[in-house]
Structure formats: structure tokens, C-alpha cells
Amino acid sequence: MAIARQDVNISSPEATTSDAQSTANPTVLVFDSGVGGLSIYREIREKLPDAHYIYVFDNEAFPYGEKPQEFIIERVVRIVSAVAQQHELAAIVIACNTASTVSLPALRAKFTDIPIVGVVPAIKPAAKLTCNGVVGLLATRATVKRPYTHELIERFATECKVHLLGSAELVELAEKKLHGEKVSCDELRRILAPWLKMKEPPDTVVLGCTHFPLLEEELLSVLPDGTRIIDSGGAIARRTAWLVVNQDKIRGSKEISFAYCLKEDEYSELLKPVLADFGFKMLRKLAL
């Protein structure tokens, strides 16, 4: 069996749960194109249990992976703007690797008074943790192809062999698991076959998509013994909590946590019980 997911520190000042509890219901926006961002939200909620959360998923344009960069930037800025016009936000978390790698500069230019946190593949800590010098990045095909990903590898993992594996099927499997469907380990073995067949496979695997931590248990059962699985969820949570707790002005809300979708359809209806399990008792449609 592989080793459980490692909690790596790739962000600055850490916030504790006791610190977070002193904050009076700040509103934190967590955005993703799908439901993978719930894995990030889950980590943040552990640090800020008393915060008010708004989860937004763009089911109208999901998945972002194959969309043009210009489309993603314009789309994300529009969606975040629509939420910010209606709610006073203490922090914005872009819980999507694809959106983070292209839209953060535009968002930070527009929302200069709201801290914004993005998600990037944890290449740097993986390069430090590996014992055999072989790192695997498991991500969407788009993240695997993006120049930003290769820049991270060139900056932080030049002394390692980094094997990239892009899969849209894993995203679909994670979504199905959230709906209560059993994940086939045989299917995972087929997807991971390029690594499993190697004489020296990665001993450290980076989960480069926020959907993939939802499959952690199944991935651990399929990967070789001793494999470390890491992602940036814990670091993102610590960074978000620190930014919220250390604000001069607390942006508070008395609302219950809820979710926004961009399109009301059968898919969004099926997600309602899933979202409720995560603490989002209400699902609304966001008008752009």
C-alpha cells in the first residue's frame, strides 16, 4: 500500500484553528469549474470552522481543461465579480489548477482589496521529499501541457525525473464518487499503467488537480508500496486562514454557507445532497 497523503507546507505564515475561531464569520469564496474544489474547501474549513463559505462551481462551462486561456480568464473574472457585487468577501480561493495558472494576475489586478489564493501543483515539496529522484505529476491534460507547469519543474525539480500523466477520466471518476458510485481500481490501474509498468516508478506523486484528493483512498490502494501522495490543499488552507485572521477589517456575514451553480440542470440537482453533506444547505443559480 502507498503512503497516505503528505501535508506539505508550501505557503507562508501558518494559522491555527484557535486563531481562526477568533474571526467573526468572515465570508470566504471558494471557486472551481466543478466539485474538485470541495477538497480544498474541506481543508480550509478545518482551519476556519466558524467562517461563512460560498462555493461556486461553473457547471455551464465545465470542464475548463480544453478551453482557451482568454476564455478562462474572462469567465473567472466575470463570475468572481458577480459574487463580489453581492457579498462582502474576506478572501477568494481559486480552487482549480487550470483557472489558477491563467487567471490570478487578472483577478489580483481587479480585486486589489481582497486577498486571493490560487492552487498550483506541489512540485517544489515533491522534489524535496522524493527518495529515488522520480516524481510523478498527476493532473489534467491541460495542466500537464501548460507552460506554467513546466516552469515549476524547471525552477524546483531540475535534479529529478518528473513524469507527467494527464487524465480527464480521473476527473470523471471523482465526480462519480461524489455521487455515491464505486470507483473501479481496475480502471485506475489502466489510467496509471504508464507509471505502474516502469522499472523505477515515481516514489512521490503530486495530485495536480483538486478533484484527485477525492480519490486518495483508491489511488493509495493501486500505487506501489511506499509511494507518497502530496497535494497543496493543506498549504492553501493555512495561507487562506492566515490572510483572513490577520485582516484589519473583518468582513462578516450572518448567512448560512451556500453554493452557486451557473446552470440549473439535472446535474446540479443531483449535486444538492452532496453539497449538503459538505455543509452547503442551499444551491442557487448565479446570474452573470
From Swiss-Prot:
GO terms for biological process: cell wall organization; peptidoglycan biosynthetic process; regulation of cell shape. Residues 8-21 have a biased composition (Polar residues). Its EC number is 5.1.1.3. The active site is at C96, C209. Residues 1-21 are annotated as: Disordered. InterPro entries: Asp/Glu/hydantoin_racemase (IPR015942), Asp/Glu_race (IPR001920), Asp/Glu_racemase_AS_1 (IPR018187), Asp/Glu_racemase_AS_2 (IPR033134), Glu_race (IPR004391). Pathway: Cell wall biogenesis; peptidoglycan biosynthesis. Substrate binds at D32, S33, Y64, G65, N97, T98, T210, H211. One of its GO terms (molecular function) is glutamate racemase activity. Keywords: Cell shape, Cell wall biogenesis/degradation, Isomerase, Peptidoglycan synthesis. It comes from the Bacteria. It is an enzyme of class 5 (isomerase). It catalyses: L-glutamate = D-glutamate. Pfam families: Asp_Glu_race (PF01177). HAMAP family: Glu_racemase (MF_00258). Provides the (R)-glutamate required for cell wall biosynthesis. Belongs to the aspartate/glutamate racemases family. PANTHER family: GLUTAMATE RACEMASE. This is Glutamate racemase. The lineage of its organism: Bacteria, Pseudomonadati, Pseudomonadota, Gammaproteobacteria, Enterobacterales.
